């Protein structure tokens, strides 16, 4: 348990190191903390903090820098998020993929690190369906999901349907089955098939099959923006190993997907410092993330990836604001 003096010194050390990236010595810490303590007293406190694994002394300097554990204590107990006024940013309502791409770019631009967004999870529920006759026994099925995604599929049928029959079938599906999962629609059709004209029942069963196929093909997608920003970060540009691990993460995406999925299970902004997530075991990377919603339902996650030496107060606000912008844009478009 740290006393108030040790907490103040740790807070001052972390803030100073985030600001200039240089190991912090006792003289600098004395000025930064505003405490009237002798250099010897400060050195003793720093030694205690080092014993607790909160700071460490690089081999090339007499100063100290925070460890991942030190950053975690700082974020959990000492961080004050100031209401910084960003320039007015708006994500216009649009197709989901466009909103997601714009959000990743916005995160990258505001943070000057890497912006990541998991695209909305496609629902197995349809909002609207239409049929268009292309030629004899050849139809276009248009499926609209609750998230606004549009899937088009061409199907071949045994019967040559007229456009009037196609409209009748679509109207029946849209009036009776909207909001139900595809599997629920399939089961209900089995029970209702006797009350429907056989040719219409066959068409709707084919439509349900192709809808299920279309929706099962869609998978979560990670949109990444600003990877090159890390080239300008001293923490990475001075160590090619750090940079290589980061770019491997962006290229493979599987680890990143798992981490953002975990983050999306919590409310509000979540911070992973260094390797504490155990999914992305890189001590030199931190991720600030938050879920976003459509009509109150979480459909994806977004965040900022950067060095552990980042301005967490600013990143929290950037991520929080962007998640709200994405939620509003997707809900409005819907």
Curated annotation (Swiss-Prot):
Keywords: Repressor, Stress response, Transcription, Transcription regulation
GO BP of this protein: negative regulation of DNA-templated transcription
One Gene Ontology molecular-function label: DNA binding
Disulfide bonds: none
SUPFAM superfamilies cross-referenced by the UniProt entry: GAF domain-like (SSF55781), Winged helix' DNA-binding domain (SSF46785)
Family statement drawn from the similarity comment of this UniProt entry: Belongs to the HrcA family.
Protein's name in the database: Heat-inducible transcription repressor HrcA
Gene that this polypeptide is encoded by: hrcA
């Amino acid at each position: 348990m740290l006393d108030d003096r040790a907490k103040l010194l740790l807070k001052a050390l972390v803030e100073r190191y985030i600001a200039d990236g240089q190991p912090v010595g006792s003289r600098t810490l004395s000025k930064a903390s505003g405490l009237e303590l002798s250099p010897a007293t400060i050195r003793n406190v720093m030694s205690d903090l080092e014993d607790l694994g909160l700071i460490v002394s690089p081999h090339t300097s007499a100063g100290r820098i925070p460890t991942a554990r030190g950053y975690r204590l700082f974020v959990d107990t000492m961080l004050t998020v100031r209401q910084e006024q960003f320039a007015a940013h708006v994500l216009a309502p649009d197709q989901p993929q466009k909103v997601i791409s714009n959000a990743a770019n916005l995160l990258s631009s505001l943070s000057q690190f890497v912006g990541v967004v998991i695209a909305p999870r496609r629902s197995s529920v349809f909002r609207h369906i239409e049929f268009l006759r292309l030629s004899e026994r050849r139809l276009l099925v248009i499926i609209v999901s609750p998230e606004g995604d549009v899937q088009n599929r061409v199907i071949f049928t045994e019967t040559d349907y007229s456009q009037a029959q196609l409209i009748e079938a679509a109207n029946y599906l849209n009036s009776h089955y909207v909001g139900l999962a595809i599997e629920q629609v399939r089961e209900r059709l089995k029970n209702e098939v006797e009350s429907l004209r056989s040719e219409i029942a066959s068409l709707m069963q084919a439509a349900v099959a192709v809808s299920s196929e279309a929706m099962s093909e869609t998978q979560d997608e990670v949109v990444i923006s600003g990877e090159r920003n890390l080239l300008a970060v001293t923490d990475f540009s001075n160590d090619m190993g750090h940079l290589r691990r980061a770019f491997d993460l962006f290229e493979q995406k599987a680890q990143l997907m798992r981490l953002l999925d975990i983050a999306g299970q919590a409310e509000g902004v979540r911070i992973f410092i260094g390797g504490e997530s155990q999914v992305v075991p890189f001590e030199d990377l931190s991720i600030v993330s938050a879920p976003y919603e459509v009509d109150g339902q979480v459909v994806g996650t977004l965040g900022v990836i950067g060095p552990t030496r980042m301005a967490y107060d600013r990143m929290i606000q950037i991520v929080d604001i962007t998640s709200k912008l994405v939620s509003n844009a997707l809900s409005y478009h819907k």
